[in-house]
Curated annotation (Swiss-Prot):
Protein name stated in the entry: Transient receptor potential cation channel subfamily M member 3
Disease in which the protein is involved: Neurodevelopmental disorder with hypotonia, dysmorphic facies, and skeletal anomalies, with or without seizures: An autosomal dominant disorder characterized by global developmental delay, moderate to severely impaired intellectual development, poor or absent speech, congenital hypotonia, dysmorphic facial features, exotropia, and musculoskeletal issues such as hip dysplasia, hip dislocation and scoliosis. About half of patients develop various types of seizures.
GO CC, alphabetical: plasma membrane
Name of the gene: TRPM3
Annotated S-S bridges: none
Effect of residue 1115 to Q: In NEDFSS; gain-of-function variant resulting in increased calcium ion transmembrane transport; basal channel activity is increased and the channel is more sensitive to stimulation by heat or the neurosteroid pregnenolone sulfate; the mutant channel can be inhibited by the TRPM3 antagonist and anti-epileptic drug primidone
Required for the inhibitory action of G-beta/gamma-subunits of heterotrimeric G-proteins: annotated segments: 617-625
Regulation: Activated by the neurosteroid pregnelonone sulfate (PregS); PregS activates the channel by shifting its current-voltage activation curve toward more negative membrane potentials and also potentiates temperature-induced activation. Activated by sphingosine. Activated by heat. Intracellular Ca(2+) inhibits TRPM3 probably via interaction with Ca(2+)/calmodulin. Intracellular Mg(2+) inhibits TRPM3 activity. Both intracellular and extracellular protons block TRPM3 through propable binding sites in the pore region.
Effect of residue 1015 to M: In NEDFSS; gain-of-function variant resulting in increased calcium ion transmembrane transport; basal channel activity is increased and the channel is more sensitive to stimulation by heat or the neurosteroid pregnenolone sulfate; the mutant channel can be down-regulated by the TRPM3 antagonist and anti-epileptic drug primidone
Tissues in which the UniProt entry reports expression: Expressed primarily in the kidney and, at lower levels, in brain, testis, ovary, pancreas and spinal cord. Expression in the brain and kidney was determined at protein level. In the kidney, expressed predominantly in the collecting tubular epithelium in the medulla, medullary rays, and periglomerular regions; in the brain, highest levels are found in the cerebellum, choroid plexus, the locus coeruleus, the posterior thalamus and the substantia nigra. Down-regulated in renal tumors compared to normal kidney. Expressed in the lens.
Length: 1732
């Protein structure tokens, strides 16, 4: 943690003062006994008291880390057997500071009872015994270098056995990490590997998405190798796109980290280089991690220290409970109110289970499979996600998961495939593969906990979906807990697909609790999902829950607390809890005007008081309950109505809301949750009203945020939300108007009981939503309201004026009937009903009877005309309105009232002009009394408007009335006129003052005409422009005042320095500079003449005043002033006016229409008569009110509303709501269509389709390749089938007693995939890489036997071209051996198509040949194409490998003879090479091969029992060649350990026997192993040489084996099986390895010194013919070759067709190696027999 440098700086200053004052104190200044404390002591104490606690806190934190965490260091040097210069801990002996071997011995002699030196040296190094704990010395912050942006990460070095609770405390408290909702533990290969680009992209994207959406932690190994490198790449891509950092914790061993010394330091910031040293075995940390925990067990360069620590930490984190939300504790019974904004007691609502953990497997070695088993066996088990296609362990796990059955069982054939796959993948022996297979099958016993992610599969498109699905499957939790997990992860897709499934049982109330959590956490998709699955919001939402939602801490920051504080007009206590009544006051404050929230009405307050009142005595005192009672009500009525409110608390519906979506939308708006508010707006009734209310609330909150000097972003965001809701309201109105105009108008005028009994038009005006008012539907309604019941289209103004001036003309006007006004106001409806009730019904009935009689008298012909006439009469009847009704409707129309008031106002102004222009008499004239009466009655009308307004309290009524601009100006004008009238009635001089006030007052009444102009379509916008320009000019005047003052004061002070104090000075300052703005520059006063006297032309002398000091400055500053004022500021004002003009011009239509509404509503509510006749209307209204109170004492005055409200019944209201919901559905459907048809969406869909098509094409290509490979495999198997058919034909020929010669011909044509020595001889020629051809001549039996016949046509497909790949290396030493690793030479064997193609060459001189020694092999070879051919005997020959004179088949120089040990297990004889003459040609005959002398053979060859002639049984078809002259081209050093040659299919691999000296096999990589070599068996290889024999060979590897077998730590870590135990398990594993290696012998893994295991040589990437070609191929069953051979071996009566006649053997060739040696049956024993 960073140190408080300011505190340290202050403490340093305090120390300086302390030193100075201590010196002063020492001088004896304050040495009295009773003197006060010295000043330095006081300062020191103050500093300690103020700042030392923070310093002590920092020190305490540092000391806590040092006390809690330790490091381990090796304190006992035990030299390693591999490297004597290193200790067993991995460090050099010199790196052990303060320790030497002798010192360590002495220390151990003291501590361990004086053990002997031999015992100490034989002692094994142990962590517990030979390491020492000490406080950690490495923790702080890492700054990774080497990139464009230096990433930072926290780190700490801890012991490997640290308690996990300390680590969790470190992460949550010191590192300030939030407890995760998910823990993803990534495991995989430690060695670097490559992923497919598409798979890497999907893996990274899915991992980041899973971590971001769920708030997860990611655990990795921390180092920059293997799978961790791929995780770092994904984090790097995410960091470049998003600022949020994912919590990625790397748990790495301290001993494997490179540049450890750079990290040592306590609470430091260390730079760290990410470039790794290629020569070092250590690795660097990954720079994209956020935190590192470095586990230390005292070792260096070894993995394993982090395994136990990581697993224990994961286990401890999984025990922590997930807090899905943190809510204030709330009990409905006790009603305990805790703090919300301050420190409060919180009830952590968990899900009952701990943090879920999931293991993610990508690639990996054998140890990963053991880790998976450990996860699955844990309690509770940890689910595992395997990424198929990443390679190695992941693919093996995926294959086992796919083909294994329940209980971990697998098919026998698939078992063999899996074993072979394990062998080839990890280069394992059969025993090791079986051991790993057992572990794999143990994992498959819990395969339901394993989820396999396959890229492109239909089940899992993304890896994050696989991770979360695996967690839900493995959690074994109830449905509510699973839903809480999905809610915490914010993954609604998981909840929809995995939790809300058919047949799921839900406890009572569980979904409601989930709904509450979703609302608190602002999970809109979950709220929608829960509503779709049956959650009733009407039952869910109660008063307590809604209040709980208002007091939640979660969600975005909002201004609700500040609004409540403003409403309360004071600071709130720290433990204050917001109530719904407070929310009601806030809503009323934001809505403004006369809006009344339901939360503040009497019924709700009484209910709230009855429910929670006893525990909250101050709740109602803060509200002012009496403000909702109209002022005109008496006290008795108030008490009576309070007594009438009777609430049944037992009613279950009393605690619920009738419109829950309304309340939730308002909650979302006030809490600034826009997405949630939009969702609730779509549901429920009255969508248009909700949109307008939300628009007004957001706009008011934005205004409050800007007034409170909050961040501008808050105000801008709220304004944006307001515009969104306003746009929704307009679009919904447009949609409803398109469908039905009449119903759309009803939507605008019907009364909204849930929204303060207002209408949508009133809400739109309150929100100042000009676009809504300017809509065509609203304007049509306003036009009808403006006309009232008058039916006029043209010249309406003239007709109305004519009706006012000539009342009889009213009879000629047309009026509308009731059917033409379905959306009339409530007052008009009531009045119309009352008038219709008073009219007699008899004349109408009589008229109908007369019409019926007239119709009956008419004939059929004129029936239609009578019907038309009847319809016209009915229509005319409806248009007939009584005279009284016409007069009433005429004068009550707003347009008539407007012109009536306008004419009266014009008359008032004319009279006012008269009284101010003529001489004022002592007493007012008649004209003046009329003006006075007009102003007086106008004041009474203003008082009526205030009293008749909707707000309850008088003060609130006044505030609402004063919000209108013209009302304020009217009040000022009336008061000013009243003052003038009072002064006018007085004597002089007050009468003159009154007259002046009259003259000033008339100015306003002329300006008042602008309000009348607002009704005009053309003049209205200009009035709006004038108002805005006046506001702009006010800002300009302030700027102008500054410039004017600066010049005016300077000018006045210079020109008039001797002025006396007077108010004239203020006038003189502004007088001239102000008029200069308008062009009056006062030229004669700019530079008046002064100084010396001037003489005119006529000789007169003019005396000039003396010049003022500095008078020349005035013209200069005046020039600057005029430049700024006249040019700059005036033009600036013109530009501002121009901008305002264009701004208003663009919205002039909306502005005029909005002002028109105000005017229409004003005249709609005014009385009929204008002032001064309005007094009669007032008297009539008072009389009606008194009569109403006398008739109905209990009537509610609020029942009759004179506003623009439509009275409709409940059925009609339901129809209106249904119509509105249909409009919403249609609106969203059209919106979706527009979105889908937009260019951006089309481009996005097209890109997705192209990407999907590319993926499909890739899959098609992969399938095509696999089909090709399968076809090749089929070809190979067909060839094998042909081979079997050939064998069957041979057996049939033998049974039918065919002749020997014909049988031999047929047998000579049969071939095998695993080419034997006889087959090599039959190929007739060798083609070397240099282009030389070596032909082989067929042996001709002396007895006259026929030569080998051409191959049968049935066997022609078996002819192939086989090639030898040999490796050559000169016998060089040192670096030359490593440089010339191998030299490839290719020898091809071509089968002769006929005997005529075999060249008859002269025979070479007979000589003892030691060429092809055939040794029996205990392993059964299979029908393979690729084999290994080793030449072991040739290793001791001193022939130069580059000598071209040496025969390929082994005819060496005549001067050497070297014993060669046999490779047979029981062989003790040696084959000796005899000198012979060099053949003249490089060709050799077949006779030479068959006649070569073999002086000594093994006992198996020389002592064969007579009863079992090897030629009596059927000759085997498969052989391994153990000697070949081609081995001279092979390397003689074990370089093959580093890189194995790649063997092509259909090839032989010559491998030197010296490569087996140290029992090392040649790991062969094969391309196309899934196609050509799928049928290859790994058992068709030669057995390696015994360990005991390697010492007899020169250049053996007996001394430097450990140097060659050292491998990288990542390789060791992958091959080792992780264990949670310490060194005891390591010792057990070491002893078990030695025991296994001693039992396996030649067929098992060879164990060398230092416990380094080397697998025996096997054909890698191969399968036997009995096994399927690949894990995904179909199985094919065939008989084993060894089974056939076993059956044939028991058939003693059968004659071998290949057996030659003994008499045909020439003399002198008894020692020769014949073909019988090449086809020895005992060399082909079953492979399984050795393992069984």
């Amino acid at each position: 943690m960073p140190e408080p440098w300011g505190t340290v700086y202050f403490l340093g200053i305090a120390q300086v003062f302390s030193f100075l004052f201590s010196w002063w104190n020492l001088e004896g200044v304050m040495n009295q006994a009773d003197a006060p404390r010295p000043l330095n002591w006081t300062i020191r104490k103050l500093c300690h008291a103020a700042f030392l606690p923070s310093v002590r806190l920092l020190k305490a934190q540092k000391s806590w880390i040092e006390r809690a965490f330790y490091k381990r260091e090796c304190v006992h040097i035990i030299p390693s057997t591999k490297d004597p210069h290193r200790c067993c801990c991995g460090r050099l002996i010199g790196q052990h500071v303060g320790l030497t071997p002798s010192i360590s011995v002495l220390q151990n002699e003291k501590n361990e009872s004086r053990l002997s030196r031999n015992d100490i040296q034989s002692e094994k190094w142990s962590i517990s015994k030979h390491t020492q704990l000490s406080p950690t010395d490495a923790f702080g912050t890492i700054e990774f270098q080497g990139g464009g942006h230096s990433n930072k990460a926290m780190y700490v070095r801890v012991s490997f056995d640290t308690k996990p609770d300390l680590l969790l405390h470190l992460m949550t408290k010191e590192w300030q990490l939030e407890l995760p909702k998910l823990l993803i533990s990534v495991h995989g290969g430690l060695q670097n590997f490559e992923l497919q680009p598409k798979l890497k992209q999907v893996f990274g994207k899915g991992l980041i998405k899973a971590a971001m959406t769920t708030g997860a932690w990611i655990f990795t190994g921390g180092v920059n190798t293997g799978v961790i490198r791929h995780v770092g790449d994904a984090l790097k891509d995410h960091a470049s796109k998003s600022r949020g950092k994912i919590c990625t914790i790397g748990i790495a061993p301290w001993g494997i980290v490179e540049n450890q010394e750079d990290l040592i330091g306590r609470d430091v910031v260390r730079p760290y280089q990410t470039m790794s040293n290629p020569m070092s075995k250590l690795t660097v940390l990954n720079s994209m991690h956020s935190h590192f925990i470095l586990a230390d067990n005292g070792t260096t360069g070894k993995y394993g220290a982090e395994v136990k620590l990581r697993r224990q930490l994961e286990k401890h984190i999984s025990l922590q409970k997930i807090n899905t939300r943190c809510l204030p504790f709330f009990s409905l019974d006790s009603r305990l109110f805790y703090s919300f904004w301050g420190s409060c007691q919180l009830d952590s609502v968990g899900i009952g289970q701990g943090v879920p953990v999931v293991a993610l497997i990508v690639e990996g070695g054998p140890n990963v499979i053991s880790i998976v088993l450990e996860y699955l066996r844990d309690t509770p088990p940890v689910p595992v996600v395997v990424c198929d296609g990443s390679g190695r362990a992941s693919d093996i796990l995926a294959f086992g998961h796919k083909y294994s059955e329940e209980g971990g069982l697998i098919n026998e054939s698939l078992r063999d495939q899996l074993l072979v796959t394990i062998q080839k993948t990890f280069t394992y022996t059969r025993t090791q593969a079986q051991h790993l297979f057992i572990i794999l099958m143990e994992c498959m016993k819990k395969k339901e906990l394993i989820t396999v992610f396959r890229m492109g599969s239909e089940g899992h498109q993304d890896i994050d979906l696989a991770i979360l699905t695996a967690l839900l499957k493995g959690a074994n939790a109830s449905a509510p807990d699973q839903l809480s997990l999905a809610l915490a992860w914010n993954r609604v897709d998981i909840a929809r697909s995995q939790i809300f499934i058919y047949g799921q049982q839900w406890p009572v109330g569980s979904l409601e609790q989930a709904m509450l959590d979703a609302l608190v956490l602002d999970r809109v998709d979950f709220v929608k999902l829960l509503i779709e699955n049956g959650v009733s919001m009407h039952r869910f939402l109660t008063i307590s829950r809604l209040e709980e939602l208002y007091n939640t801490r979660h969600g975005p920051s909002n201004t609700l607390y500040h609004l409540v504080r403003d409403v309360k007009k004071g600071n709130l206590p720290p433990d204050y809890r917001i109530s719904l009544i407070d929310i009601g006051l806030v809503i009323e404050y934001l809505m403004g005007g006369a809006y009344r929230c339901n939360y503040t009405r009497k019924r709700f307050r009484t209910l709230y008081h009855n429910l929670f009142g006893p525990k909250r005595p101050k709740a109602l005192k803060l509200l002012g309950m009496e403000d909702d009672i109209p002022l005109r009500r008496g006290r008795k009525t108030t008490k009576k109505r309070e007594e009438e409110v009777d609430i049944d608390l037992d009613d279950p519906e009393i605690n619920h809301f009738p419109f829950p979506f309304h309340e939730l939308m308002v909650w979302a708006v006030l809490m600034k949750r826009q997405k949630m508010a939009l969702f609730f707006w779509q549901h429920g009734e009255e969508a248009m009203a909700k949109a307008l209310v939300a628009c007004k609330l957001c706009k008011a909150m934005a205004h409050e945020a800007s007034e409170n000097d909050m961040v501008d972003d808050i105000s801008q965001e709220l304004n944006h939300n307001s515009r969104d809701f306003g746009q929704l309201a307009v679009e919904l109105l447009d949609q409803s108007y398109k469908q039905d105009e009449q119903l759309a108008m009803k939507l605008l005028t019907y009364e909204l009981k849930n929204w303060s009994n207002a209408t949508c038009l009133q809400l739109a005006v309150a929100a100042k939503h000009r676009d809504f008012i300017a809509h065509t539907c609203s304007q049509m309604l306003l036009t009808d309201m403006w006309m009232g019941r008058l039916r006029m289209r043209k010249n309406s103004g003239l007709k109305v004026i004519l009706g006012i001036l000539l009342p009889p003309s009213i009879l000629s006007l047309e009026f509308k009937n009731k059917d033409d006004m379905p959306y009339m106001s409530q007052a008009q409806e009531i009045h119309l009903q009352e008038k219709e009730a008073e009219e007699p019904e008899k004349p109408t009935k009589e008229k109908e009877e007369e019409d019926m009689e007239l119709t009956a008298m008419l004939g059929r012909n004129n029936g239609e005309s009578s019907r038309k006439k009847d319809e016209e009469e009915v229509q005319s009847k409806h248009r007939l309105i009584p005279l009284g009704r016409k007069i009433y409707e005429f004068y009550n129309a707003p347009i008539v009232k407007f012109w009536f008031y306008t004419l009266a106002y014009i008359g008032y102004l004319m009279l006012f002009n008269y009284i101010v222009l003529v001489k004022m008499e002592r007493w007012p004239s008649t004209q003046e009394w009329i003006v006075i009466s007009y102003i007086f009655t106008l004041g009474i009308e203003k008082m009526r408007e205030i009293l008749m307004s909707e707000p309850g309290k008088l003060l609130q009524k006044v505030k609402v009335w004063l919000q209108e601009y013209w009302n304020v100006t009217d009040l000022i004008a009336i008061l000013l006129f009243s003052v003038g009238m009072i002064l006018r009635l007085q004597d002089q001089p007050f009468r003159s003052d009154g007259r002046v006030i009259y003259c000033v007052n008339i100015i306003y009444w002329y300006i008042r005409l602008l309000d009348i102009f607002g009704v005009n379509k053309y003049l209205g916008p200009y009035v709006m422009m004038i108002g805005k320009m006046m506001i702009d000019m006010m800002y300009f005047v302030i700027i102008m005042l500054v410039v004017l003052m600066s010049f005016g004061v300077a000018r006045q002070a210079i020109l008039f320095p001797n002025e006396e104090p007077s108010w004239k000075l203020a006038k003189n300052i502004f007088y001239m500079p102000y008029w200069m703005i308008y062009g009056e520059v006062f030229a004669d006063q700019i530079d008046p003449p002064c100084g010396q006297n001037e003489t005119r032309e006529d000789g007169k002398i003019i005396q000039l005043p003396p010049c003022k000091t500095g008078a020349w400055i005035v013209p200069a500053i005046m020039a600057c002033y005029l430049l700024v004022a006249n040019i700059l500021l005036v033009n600036l004002l013109i530009a501002v006016f121009n901008n305002t003009f264009f701004e208003v011009k663009s919205i002039s239509n909306q502005v005029w229409k909005f002002q028109r509404y105000q005017l229409i509503m004003t005249f709609h509510e005014r009385p009929v008569l204008p002032p001064p006749l309005i007094i009669f209307s007032h008297m009539t209204m008072i009389f009606q009110h008194l009569c109403c109170r006398w008739r109905k004492h209990e009537s509610d005055p609020d029942e009759r509303d004179y506003g623009l409200k439509l009275f409709i019944t409940d059925d009609e209201l339901k129809k209106v709501h249904d119509f509105e919901e249909q409009c919403i559905e249609e609106y969203f459907r059209e919106k979706d269509d527009r979105f889908n048809s937009s260019n951006d969406e089309r481009i996005r869909v097209t890109s997705e389709r192209v990407e999907n098509m590319s993926m499909r094409l890739e899959e098609v290509n992969e399938r095509e390749h696999s089909m090709k490979a399968s076809l090749q495999t089929v070809d190979i198997r067909l060839a094998q089938l042909e081979d079997l058919i050939g064998r069957m034909a041979t057996a049939l020929e033998r049974l039918t007693g065919l002749e020997r010669a014909e049988s031999n011909k047929i047998r000579s044509r049969t071939s095998s995939d695993c080419t034997d020595a006889a087959y090599i001889v039959r190929q007739s020629s060798f083609n070397s890489q240099e282009g030389n051809t070596f032909k082989l001549q067929e042996s001709i039996d002396p007895a006259g036997e026929e030569t080998m016949s051409p191959t049968s046509p049935t066997l022609m497909p078996r002819m192939r071209s086989h090639s030898f790949y040999s490796v050559n290396m000169k016998d060089k030493g040192g670096i030359e051996k490593l440089e010339s690793i191998f030299k490839e030479r290719s020898l091809s064997l071509h089968r002769a198509t006929s005997s005529h193609s075999v060249a008859k060459e002269p025979k070479a001189p007979a000589a003892p040949a030691n060429t092809l020694a055939i040794v029996p092999d205990s392993r059964r070879p299979s029908s393979c194409i690729d084999i290994y051919v080793s030449a072991m005997d040739e290793l001791h020959c001193d022939i130069d490998p580059l000598d071209n004179s040496v025969n390929i088949l082994g005819l060496g120089e005549p001067s050497f003879s070297t014993p060669v040990p046999s490779t047979a297990p029981s062989s003790s004889a040696y084959a000796t090479l005899a000198p012979t003459d060099r053949p003249p040609s490089r060709s050799i005959d077949f006779e030479d091969i068959t006649s070569m002398d073999t002086r000594s053979f093994s006992s198996d060859y020389t002592h064969l029992p007579e009863c079992q002639n090897p030629w009596d049984s059927e000759p085997p078809m498969y052989h391994t060649i153990e000697r070949s002259k081609s081995s001279r081209y092979l390397a003689t050093t074990p370089f093959l350990l580093e890189e194995a040659p790649i063997v092509k299919s259909h090839s032989f691999m010559f491998s030197p026997s010296r490569s087996y000296y140290a029992n090392f096999g040649v790991p062969v990589k094969t391309a196309e192993y899934t196609s050509i070599t799928d049928c290859i068996d790994t058992r068709c290889v030669n057995a390696p040489q015994a360990i005991a024999d390697r010492a007899a060979f020169p250049g053996g590897l007996g001394d430097k084996v450990e140097d060659l077998t050292c491998c990288h730590p990542e390789r060791e870590a992958e091959l080792s099986h992780p264990s949670s135990d310490s060194e005891e398990n390591e010792a057990k594993g070491r002893r078990a390895t030695i025991a296994i290696s001693s039992q396996e012998g030649d067929n098992s893994e060879r164990t060398l010194s230092n416990n380094i295991t080397v697998p025996k040589i096997e054909r890698a990437n191969s399968y036997s013919a009995e096994e399927p070609s690949a894990p995904y191929a179909h199985t094919r069953k065939s008989f084993s070759i060894s089974d056939k051979l076993d059956r044939q071996r028991n058939t003693a009566s059968l004659r071998n067709p290949f057996q030659r006649s003994k008499s045909s053997k020439p003399e002198g060739r008894g020692d020769s190696l014949s073909m019988r040696r090449l086809s020895r049956t005992s060399a082909f024993q079953s492979f399984e027999s050795k393992h069984n």
